[in-house]
């Protein structure tokens, strides 16, 4: 009997140790560097010209359908002002933000596709919250630098051509252990380089600590690190396998960092920027063009959650659906299964955070110019389903509402905020246009409009101006 008891205790000890290992923060290596003054502008190396042959001009280009082919327009309820001068709330949710808890920052994170990667939606949310620019900190940056369609809150990024992107949503083995943004950048080519000017603009200060996030493997990796144009410092990354951090420490703000791969294979997983000043509001935006929610399904959750052990979020948002709806044929049952499992994994990583699922906007269909020409001559409408993607996006929005309710989250639909199915055609006709010419994406003005709609539908209110710099935020709505 005693042997059985000892065996049980021993097994419990092993399980406890395993749990501690799983929940341990990433391994940390520190490198003291010397920040410099009077450094030169960061200039990226010119890319080699594309070898693709020039494409012939399309004799029958795609364009907007003629106006009389479009569905009946539906408008959202008119916005009115309250006695306080704030936009009237259309949603029934309680206000999500209230000043409280001095000394504790409010942290928000949002994962998404190209709609988030552009950065305009999140920037407008910060503006609507009335948070001063110097009180907002984007401290976690995903490994998406250099990717077309990505805007980051740093001045410049330079990526040499040897780096390969490993987005998690593709489900490949090399991306199952991702960085915080559910993606990696990989190179095993000597002299591959990454460089950043981490300042927000030329007049802004840098950061006293710059953390390079990476995956430590069993093989050592040799790097050379340069700060603010100074001499390279050799670094050998070697340690326990798993998520790891190389922290650059300086006595004054760091503005520029250059990383060169000397030998080995590096899986870069993001940047963390830190300064000694407390920031009352932190919003981390993890957007990647082409992404789907499947990145949350395929990720090794035990690996992923270690990035956030010391970074609890009060609010987590997932903005996906546009790329899922582009699949042909679209399988709603398969989408529901993927979404359900992905949201379950997200809730495993952030069990106490308020969560919001954001469904895609309306999407239109372009037609060949010849179709519009023939229609004008024949006087009858062509047999083209202009509501094909609008209908799919409506199904995705409905599914997200159902899955959100099951998971204890909130759901919000860009398409509903636009006025429903078919509104992409009319958003494209706004002045300035709110819809991009592809009828899939939005213009900067369109993203800002969506952010304003989201802000009002959530029942959020701006922070009081006099105390915005000192006031910290919390979620006033119950944890769902």
Question: What name fits each language-model region?
Answer:
Residues 21-67, 71-80, 85-86, 138-243, ...:
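Conserved catalytic region of serine esterases and O-acyltransferases that act on ester linkages
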Residues 93, 117, 121, 125, ...:
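Stable alpha-helical elements in mature extracytoplasmic
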Residues 87-100, 296-308, 340-345, 366, ...:
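Alpha-helical scaffolding within the catalytic cores
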Residues 217-219, 278-293, 322-337, 360-398, ...:
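Serine-dependent acyl-ester chemistry module
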Residues 301-302, 363-480:
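Catalytic His-Asp segment of secreted/periplasmic serine-dependent ester chemistry enzymes
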Residues 108-112:
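Short hydrophobic beta-strand that contains or immediately precedes a catalytic carboxylate
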Residues 107, 117-340, 348:
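Conserved SGNH/GDSL esterase-like catalytic core that processes O-acyl groups on lipids
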Residues 6-14:
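Bacterial N-terminal signal peptides
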């Amino acid at each position: 009997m005693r042997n059985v008891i000892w065996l049980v205790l021993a097994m419990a000890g092993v399980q406890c140790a395993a749990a501690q290992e799983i929940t341990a923060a990433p391994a940390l290596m520190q490198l003291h560097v010397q920040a410099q003054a009077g450094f030169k502008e960061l200039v990226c190396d010119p890319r080699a010209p594309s070898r693709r042959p020039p494409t012939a001009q399309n004799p029958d280009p795609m364009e907007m359908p003629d106006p009389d082919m479009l569905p009946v327009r539906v408008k959202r309820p008119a916005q009115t002002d309250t006695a306080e001068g704030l936009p009237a709330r259309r949603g029934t949710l309680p206000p999500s933000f209230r000043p409280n808890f001095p000394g504790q920052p409010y942290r928000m994170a949002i994962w998404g596709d190209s709609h988030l990667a552009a950065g305009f939606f999140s920037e407008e949310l910060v503006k609507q919250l009335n948070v001063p620019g110097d009180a907002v900190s984007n401290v976690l940056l995903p490994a998406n630098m250099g990717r077309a369609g990505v805007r980051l809150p740093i001045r410049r990024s330079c990526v040499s051509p040897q780096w390969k992107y490993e987005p998690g949503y593709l489900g490949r083995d090399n991306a199952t252990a991702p960085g915080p943004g559910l993606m990696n950048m990989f190179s095993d080519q000597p002299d591959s380089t990454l460089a950043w000017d981490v300042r927000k603009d030329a007049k802004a200060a840098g950061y006293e600590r710059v953390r390079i996030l990476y995956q430590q493997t069993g093989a050592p990796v040799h790097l050379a690190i340069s700060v603010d144009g100074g001499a390279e410092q050799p670094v050998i990354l070697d340690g326990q396998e798993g998520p790891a951090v190389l922290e650059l420490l300086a006595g004054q703000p760091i503005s520029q960092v250059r990383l060169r791969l000397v030998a080995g294979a590096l899986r870069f997983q993001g940047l963390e920027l830190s300064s000694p000043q407390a920031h009352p509001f932190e919003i981390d935006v993890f957007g990647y063009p082409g992404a789907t929610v499947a990145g949350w399904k395929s990720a090794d959750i035990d690996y992923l959650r270690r990035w956030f052990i010391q970074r609890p979020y009060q609010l987590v948002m997932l903005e996906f659906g546009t790329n899922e709806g582009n699949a042909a044929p679209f399988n709603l049952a398969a989408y529901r299964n993927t979404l359900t499992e992905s949201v379950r994994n997200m809730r495993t990583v952030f069990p106490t955070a308020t969560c919001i699922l954001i469904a895609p906007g309306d999407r239109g269909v372009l037609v060949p110019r010849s179709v519009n020409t023939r229609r004008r001559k024949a006087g009858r409408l062509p047999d083209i389903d202009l509501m094909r993607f609008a209908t799919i996006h409506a199904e995705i929005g409905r599914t997200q509402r159902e899955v959100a309710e099951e998971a204890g989250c909130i759901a919000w639909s860009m398409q509903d905020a636009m006025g429903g199915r078919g509104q992409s055609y009319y958003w494209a006709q706004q002045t300035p246009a709110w819809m991009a010419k592809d009828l899939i994406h939005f213009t900067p003005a369109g993203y800002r409009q969506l952010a304003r709609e989201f802000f009002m539908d959530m029942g959020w209110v701006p922070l009081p101006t006099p105390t915005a710099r000192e006031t910290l935020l919390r979620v006033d709505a119950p944890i769902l």
